[in-house]
Amino acid sequence: MWNDIEKAGVELADELCKHDPVRPNLPQHWRVVPNWREVFYLKTNHMIDSVLCVAHLDGIPINEDELLSFGNGNISVFYSVWSNKKGSGRKIVLDTLDLLKSQHSNNRYVTMSPKTEMAMKFHTDNGAKLLQENPLTYNFEYTIIFEYE
């Protein structure tokens, strides 16, 4: 049904994030810095089905100002996700978790989500636990179980 997730380069990320309904105010040029901030996407037949923006930070942000100011670290923060096709939002979150688990030494995977019922339902239905409720956002945490041989 879908291809594997792909990581967007700077130019494609700029184009994709022009349509970000969750965090439209974030600067386009801020979203991609190698090994720090990444944009992933799913597509089918050259059509974008979903997009997920991730920043690897040294703290858990509760608002956009903190998101923009925190430094590089080992907490992967999913700060924006949107989809154009049913089921692709779930797929990109779970597939990106698997990818990051295999590629990074990060030890926490959290969101900075809008404080909406939709965000609450989406993340809890996908296995995340509410970490904290903030004035404008929720932080959810996805627990990753590492398999050792």
Model-flagged regions — what are they?
Residues 110-121, 136-139:
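Conserved beta-strand-loop-alpha-helix junction that forms the acyl-donor binding cleft
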Residues 121-129:
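Short, aromatic/basic amphipathic alpha-helical patches
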Residues 29-50, 55-58:
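A short helix-loop-beta-strand connector motif used in the catalytic cores of GNAT acetyltransferases and
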Residues 129-143:
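Conserved catalytic-core motifs of GNAT/GCN5-like acyltransferases
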Residues 1-31, 41:
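Short amphipathic alpha-helix that is part of the acyltransferase structural core
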